[in-house]
Amino acid sequence: MARLVGVDLPREKRLEIALTYIFGVGRTRAKETLAATGVSPDLRVRDLSDDDLVALRDHIEGNYRVEGDLRREVAADIRRKVEIGTYQGLRHRRGLPVRGQRTKTNARTRKGPKRTVAGKKKAGRK
C-alpha cells in the first residue's frame, strides 16, 4: 500500500480517486496535483513508481494543508467562533445546524435521536 501524508491509499483504485482519501484533497485538487506532477490520472496506485510518490508527496505537502493540520485549523476556527460568541459559535455549542437550515423538522443528524417530552401532546381540534 502506498502512503501519502499519513494515509494508506487503496491499491486497486485509479490515482485520481485514491488521492481523495486524503482529508483536504477532493477531485479538483487531485486533478490539479496530477497535472502539476505530470503523473497520469488513469494509473493505478499499485503501479506507482517511487519517483511518482515522492513528486506527489512534495506537491501536496508543499501546496496544501491536509490531514492533521487542516483538522486542527477547522477545530480552532470553530473553537474561536464559540469563544467570541458569534451566532455560528452558539449553534455549534448547542449542537444545531450552523448554516441556516430549518430545524422545525429534519436536522436529526445534528440534533441526534428524538427525545420525547413528557406532558406534551399534539393540540386537538374542537
UniProtKB/Swiss-Prot annotation:
UniProtKB keywords: Ribonucleoprotein, Ribosomal protein, RNA-binding, rRNA-binding, tRNA-binding
Single GO cellular component term: cytosol
GO biological process per UniProt: translation
Top-level lineage group: Bacteria
InterPro entries from the UniProt entry: Rbsml_uS13_C, Ribosomal_uS13, Ribosomal_uS13-like_H2TH, Ribosomal_uS13_bac-type, Ribosomal_uS13_CS
Region (Disordered): 92-126
GO MF entries: rRNA binding; structural constituent of ribosome; tRNA binding
Similarity comment text for this entry: Belongs to the universal ribosomal protein uS13 family.
Quaternary structure and interacting proteins, as annotated: Part of the 30S ribosomal subunit. Forms a loose heterodimer with protein S19. Forms two bridges to the 50S subunit in the 70S ribosome.
Protein task: Located at the top of the head of the 30S subunit, it contacts several helices of the 16S rRNA. In the 70S ribosome it contacts the 23S rRNA (bridge B1a) and protein L5 of the 50S subunit (bridge B1b), connecting the 2 subunits; these bridges are implicated in subunit movement. Contacts the tRNAs in the A and P-sites.
Protein name stated in the entry: Small ribosomal subunit protein uS13
Source species of the chain: Kineococcus radiotolerans (strain ATCC BAA-149 / DSM 14245 / SRS30216)
Gene that encodes it: rpsM
